[in-house]
Amino acid sequence: MPELPEVETSRRGIEPHLVGATILHAVVRNGRLRWPVSEEIYRLSDQPVLSVQRRAKYLLLELPEGWIIIHLGMSGSLRILPEELPPEKHDHVELVMSNGKVLRYTDPRRFGAWLWTKELEGHNVLTHLGPEPLSDDFNGEYLHQKCAKKKTAIKPWLMDNKLVVGVGNIYASESLFAAGIHPDRLASSLSLAECELLARVIKAVLLRSIEQGGTTLKDFLQSDGKPGYFAQELQVYGRKGEPCRVCGTPIVATKHAQRATFYCRQCQK
């Protein structure tokens, strides 16, 4: 599933082609996504794009009359393409722009979303979200406070959007390795110093992944059709049985809440 770096990479890739251009119309080839494509999107016409923003894993396209909320789901990607390029099997939604380009949404598993809202505030998919991990609001003191009474393992807690948004399976595993923290540790057992370190490395890991265009393991592509290259730098995720790049101990894979977790027994305590 695309996580924060992949969504931010998509935002940065599409923004220059959308802001300042006008949506001439939308084409919905298959509206049966995770939720049905909003009827307002079918009727879009002559709408200038004012901004392209991100909240958590949602892309937010600001138009004069409202907002398009896009979620990439499990396998979605957004590409900027020439209008004349014919669609392929899994190209479900596109915005035809005044500059001769199209924003084309591809989603083999159809678990994403294209929604419309007049106002962002109070929309059900955006309520109850924690702070952005790259913001000043997410820091060691905040993390320590939120972990203090939490009697669950730190790995699934990091993936809870009420704590912090956008830290999914890949980056939770990678960040815990970078901080030397075992994923099975109770969240409440982390000291303030450990929380400060963990908050710092989460920011560093996410920023590095954004620099590399995100992580492509299967379906994710950047807006120019290229894969994300952070997969080449993964320290533990997807490396079961391979030697740790630091100490040589074989990487272990377990499951938390049906999600694979990767770690080094020697480096993480």
Curated annotation (Swiss-Prot):
Keywords: DNA damage, DNA repair, DNA-binding, Glycosidase, Hydrolase, Lyase, Metal-binding, Multifunctional enzyme, Zinc, Zinc-finger
UniProt cross-references to InterPro entries, sorted A to Z: DNA_glyclase/AP_lyase_DNA-bd, DNA_glyclase_Znf_dom_DNA_BS, Formamido-pyr_DNA_Glyclase, FPG_cat, MutM-like_N-ter, Ribosomal_uS13-like_H2TH, Znf_DNA_glyclase/AP_lyase, Znf_FPG/IleRS
Source domain of life: Bacteria
Zinc finger intervals, FPG-type: 235-269
Free-text remark on how the cofactor is bound: Binds 1 zinc ion per subunit.
Stated role: Involved in base excision repair of DNA damaged by oxidation or by mutagenic agents. Acts as a DNA glycosylase that recognizes and removes damaged bases. Has a preference for oxidized purines, such as 7,8-dihydro-8-oxoguanine (8-oxoG). Has AP (apurinic/apyrimidinic) lyase activity and introduces nicks in the DNA strand. Cleaves the DNA backbone by beta-delta elimination to generate a single-strand break at the site of the removed base with both 3'- and 5'-phosphates.
Full protein name: Formamidopyrimidine-DNA glycosylase
Organism of derivation: Escherichia coli (strain 55989 / EAEC)
Gene from which this protein is expressed: mutM
